[in-house]
Amino acid sequence: MARPTKKGGAKKQKKNVPNGIAHIQSTFNNTIVTIADTRGDVISWASAGSSGFKGAKKGTPFAAQTAADNAARRAMEQGMRQIEVMVSGPGAGRETAIRALQGAGLEITLIRDVTPIPHNGCRPPKRRRV
């Protein structure tokens, strides 16, 4: 029986995007770095989990640094040079991720904290007793 020929999928072409926006979402359990162009189309992304960390290690500053480094490297392959950074969340990897983006060679023009603050919204989780 003849095997059907495989149709080639659409290859992602390299765009030349000189500047964009990096969104860093840092929670207690993970850090996600998404780099988009100024229109909002995602160029690259990485997280502590996608960078090879598992479990509690995903919440560490080193995992955030690795994730930011991976995302920055992929964005620079697309031609990105300047970024604005939007940081949200209370996690441990906030500052480390910003330093990693800078260390990778991206020029940071703006850092903005966009953490949502409730006007007494949801009830917070119960206090931990260790």
Swiss-Prot record:
Name the UniProt record assigns to this protein: Small ribosomal subunit protein uS11
Domain of life: Bacteria
Disulfide bond positions: none
UniProt cross-references to PROSITE patterns, sorted A to Z: RIBOSOMAL_S11 (PS00054)
Function (record text): Located on the platform of the 30S subunit, it bridges several disparate RNA helices of the 16S rRNA. Forms part of the Shine-Dalgarno cleft in the 70S ribosome.
Native source organism of the sequence: Gloeothece citriformis (strain PCC 7424)
Pfam families: Ribosomal_S11
Name of the gene: rpsK
InterPro entries tied to this protein: Ribosomal_uS11, Ribosomal_uS11_bac-type, Ribosomal_uS11_CS, Ribosomal_uS11_sf
GO biological process: translation
GO cellular component: ribonucleoprotein complex; ribosome
Molecular-function annotations in GO: rRNA binding; structural constituent of ribosome
Family: Belongs to the universal ribosomal protein uS11 family.
This protein's UniProt keywords: Ribonucleoprotein, Ribosomal protein, RNA-binding, rRNA-binding
NCBIfam families: PRK05309.1 (NF003698), uS11_bact (TIGR03632)
Assembly and interaction partners: Part of the 30S ribosomal subunit. Interacts with proteins S7 and S18. Binds to IF-3.
